[in-house]
Amino acid sequence: MSPSKKKVVVLGSTGSIGESTIKVANDLSDRIEIIGIAACKSDEKLISQLKETGAMSACLTDQESAQRASTNMPDGVRFFHGEEGLIELATLEEADIVLISIVGVAGLRPALAALEAGKDLAVASKEILVMAGQAVMETAAKNRAKVLPVDSEHNAIFQCLEGKESKDAVSYTHLRAH
């Protein structure tokens, strides 16, 4: 019996990490399904990604971009806007994992909302861990959710937040070439 598909929401889908996530999901379509995507201003790219992924929920945080995109949304897509829209996506009932790849502090409230809803959180925004690492980890523990660091820098911060000594755990770190 094959495991069920992981349903993923990508907050920051038009950035490099978001685009890479969509590519991986397409390559592993038997195991990963993108169900929601969000961006700040890239309305045309977001609409293209909706068509590519088949995601049925989307958000643009920039009001002007959201207004432009609202008339071009594919049929049946639930369309949200603003920070509240990010929170709506992060707490979609059907989501298993929420990837936060939003730059800066804008991802904090959606990250905490996802964890409070019991969603596993993949963190590609180190600001969230630096700013509110203890709150993130406590919220995850309270709701039996996992926090998954996406790259080496976040993994190092995550290990510090876990409070484990280096001899207690061995961790594989993925290094990216720039």
Task: Indicate residue ranges for each PLM-predicted region.
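Conserved small/polar residues in nucleotide/adenosyl-binding loops
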Residues: 173-178
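N-terminal Rossmann-like dinucleotide-binding module
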Residues: 2-58
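Beta-loop-alpha module in the N-terminal Rossmann-like domain of NAD(P)-dependent dehydrogenases
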Residues: 81-113
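Residue-level signal for inorganic ion chemistry
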Residues: 14, 50, 98, 118, ...
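Redox-cofactor binding/interface segments in oxidoreductases and associated redox assembly factors
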Residues: 60, 99-101, 123
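Short acidic-hydrophobic, aromatic-tinged amphipathic segments that line or gate anion-handling sites
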Residues: 60, 78-83
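Short glycine/serine/threonine-rich phosphate/pyrophosphate-binding segments
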Residues: 16-21, 45, 105-111, 123-124, ...
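Rossmann-fold NAD(P)-binding glycine/threonine-rich loop
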Residues: 126-144
